[in-house]
Structure formats: C-alpha cells, structure tokens
Amino acid sequence: MVRVTSVGCFLLVIVSLNLVVLTNACIPEGSSCSSSGSCCHKSCCRWTCNQPCLIPGKRAKLLEFFRQR
C-alpha cells in the first residue's frame, strides 16, 4: 500500500511541475508582444521583445534628417 501511494505522489509531482513549466513559458527575443511581462527578458519595445530596448536619441534623429536631404 505504501508503494502505490508513493508512486501516485511521484506522478502527481511530475504533472504539477509540467503545468508550472507550461504556464511560465515566455516569448523569445524578436517575437511580437503586448506587455513586458510576457517577454523572456522583460523588455517589450514597440510591440517586439528586444533586449535592451533601443530608442533612437537626438543624434540618430539628426542623422536620419540629413540622410533625407
């Protein structure tokens, strides 16, 4: 009787661990996202998982302006 109970507990632990892994799955880098919490690196930038989140500054905007002329 003890052996059956321990096998049942062991199987229950395996099933519960599989459920935890499935619910904690994160979105890999480069995939589309809606919030930072769903990305693996916790960085959702412009609806894409990126690490780090790069936002162009004044210099990048100025260079883009001169390229258009």
Swiss-Prot record:
Q: Give the UniProt subcellular location, in the record's own words.
A: Secreted
Entry-annotated residues carrying Proline amide: 56
Keywords, alphabetical: Amidation, Cleavage on pair of basic residues, Disulfide bond, Gamma-carboxyglutamic acid, Secreted, Signal, Toxin
Give residues where 4-carboxyglutamate occurs. Answer: 29
Q: Quote the PTM field.
A: Contains 4 disulfide bonds.
Single GO term (MF):
toxin activity
Q: What is this protein called?
A: Conotoxin Gla-TxXI
Q: What is the lineage of its organism?
A: Eukaryota, Metazoa, Spiralia, Lophotrochozoa, Mollusca
